[in-house]
Amino acid sequence: MKATTSLATSCRRLLLWGVLTLQCLFSTAQKRFTADVEQQAEKILSQMTLDEKLSYIGGINWMYTRPLERFGIPRLKMSDGPQGLGTHGPSTAYPCALMLAATWNEQLATEYGSALGKDCRARGVHVVLGPAVNIYRAPMCGRNFEYMGEDPYLTSRMATGYIKGVQGQGVMATIKHFIANNSDYDRDHISSDIDERTLNEIYFPSFRAAVQEAEVGAVMSSYNLLNGIYTTEHPWLLKDVLRQQWGFKGILMSDWGSTHHCIPAVKGGLDLEMPAGSKMQPEELKYYLRTGDILSLIHISEPTRLALIS
């Protein structure tokens, strides 16, 4: 029954995402999860078929969510990234996040995010896949330039400003990579073994600030394992910490190709598999629904609802 509840939750979140994004198409103001938006999502959810729900929790065409054309919900267009739009044609290259963090200027981070948000709107991008806030632990990590250093306080302040700037333009920001993605080498197999105190003092602060202060719309999980469990299927990390302790209401998506198993990801709390539903496959989910082993219809609805209102 627990796995059932997770899928229901993910469907609702995805629906909330879609409805909220539809509103943002006509306004640059940051939208929030209002009662009206929730009601719209619930109405759509009640009319969706099982196939529509199962398909909606996986992306399509590399950088898009699925449209729900009969409900007027467009596909959501995503783009990397932290330092400018890295997809959908030539674009402006912004200074890297490390340079931005070196200014210690949160207002500048907000202006940076606002400019990036305007760039997104000009290109029809609904969701930008940034900021990235991995804490520096491995100096040889090839993506350190994308991040904001090793100081959890500085990273929290700069990421919060960045997110407020982006979302102030009616574009969804995505904080990544949750969590402890300290090296890109062999990242699909590395386990970052970290005690709870270190997580709370070093790794969590920037993500917690993004959720509680900036109300970030999306969180992207990482490729690695945390203490022997993949972050895309880690109930303590995704449900207990992110959802319950911090009160995150947005979408939790996988990094591209970082979903490793279907049912553990569903039970763990993952909402959206990107770039496609290759592990959380509709046919496999249908099988478990039919057999009644660990899934039922409730489990499919919440990710869809959240995507609609976001």
Language-model segments: residues:
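Glycoside hydrolase catalytic-domain context in secreted enzymes
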Residues: A29-S301, R305
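Bacterial Sec-dependent N-terminal signal peptides
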Residues: M1-R32
